[in-house]
């Protein structure tokens, strides 16, 4: 009997082909654990600097609670990378680790998408999406870099291997060619995300960012072997769908009721919106996002919306915004200069806009309920965040000390806010006490009689921009150095001007020009009061350019005071 020939079956894939599947699941589990830990941290963690702890310990606790990217990304990637190098040889089985880089970048996307949900119902009570802006920015960069390294290392590996044709591996194989396209897109995104490029043309960055992210999510499953369709593609598509639904369900059309602007003096404007566009209650310092396009317009999805802090309270009859409209034009120019600026965005009465949603501020709940010793420091258009907070605490009977400090460049900005208070009938005299006051510091020169000489001093370039519409590059010119804060003991012979210019709030609002501003001097009573009350009752709010936020933060760290700041960075 003739023996049948021996048939040998050769495995289609090597023994390492499925080596990274479990690692992908591990990354997903770590992401889930991180989210649970984050929720517990915000629910039960302590952001208050303990008076008995060291400054270093307080700093670490605050950075951890504040979702500092360096701390949180360090913890996350330490956990993710623990089993990265395991079992397989780095020299003879390097392909395993090159593929692992790609799977790692894709497996981290669900976490990134989840943290940027607006609103995020899982973290809504103790977090706002603005808390995650710095984290999201650096997390996204790391994910894209990991994915790009995956592609670069494979190209290098094939290029130096004499037994492999780079053209055949990279171009002729459909799976790898798709990966090559992804690498090119990711590289373009990284270039657009460089600080100067992003600030020069934020619209371009935003469009590229969104399109590349969608392409990365949808094309990677075509490229990846073994597949990542379940659970990663399913999760990513589900989260993308939720993002889309949020921008549809909560959006509504709106028109501007009134706009008070005087471009010959200042770019600070007061805009009034219908009260009906927001719920019956919203927290003081909340903000809204507005798009100039309707939901059916593709530009609604491609271009960024514009965030604005709400200057009014929930009980007011309208929604008021006090904003600076971005412009390259100097005060005194025609309005056409503002409109012709491609970077500018301004609200017109004759147009219809889309309100995407409203969002709470990054203010702890216990601050509203327990705060009795309050200081609020703002610069420029940061008044839109500070004013509703001041009004909220001013109306509370148990508040023992309340002071708001507003630093501005010229008197016209104060006039506009004063007009807003008068128009809305907002007077504070009925509940006035010696421990409740507003101080306005003006860095430019003016006379109380004419109010026309608005000569701004030389300023420091903060070299920064802001995402939130209540701030923009106009506020970069507002530097603490204008107020001589670094030279508190200097014998400055510059005359100081101080007066209370209003009848309605004359005893409450004090306006000072060329005043040597020092935070410690202005907050002496606040600091004295903080030593006599419970630590949870003392809070300092800050909203303005980076130099002001840094000064306020340092003061709070030194004095062991609760600190809340509103920062919106590109």
UniProtKB/Swiss-Prot annotation:
Organism from which the protein derives: Saccharomyces cerevisiae (strain YJM789)
EC id: 1.16.1.-
Entry protein name: Probable metalloreductase AIM14
Domain Ferric oxidoreductase, first and last residues per copy: 101-219
Annotated compartments: Membrane
Assembly description: Interacts with ribosomes.
Segments forming domain FAD-binding FR-type: 250-388
GO annotation, biological process: reductive iron assimilation
Biased composition (Polar residues): 481-505
UniProt key word Transcription regulation: no
Main location group: membrane
Disordered: annotated span: 481-507
GO CC, any one term: plasma membrane
Function text: Probable cell surface metalloreductase. May be involved in iron or copper homeostasis.
Topological type in the membrane: Multi-pass membrane protein
Similarity-based family: Belongs to the ferric reductase (FRE) family. AIM14 subfamily.
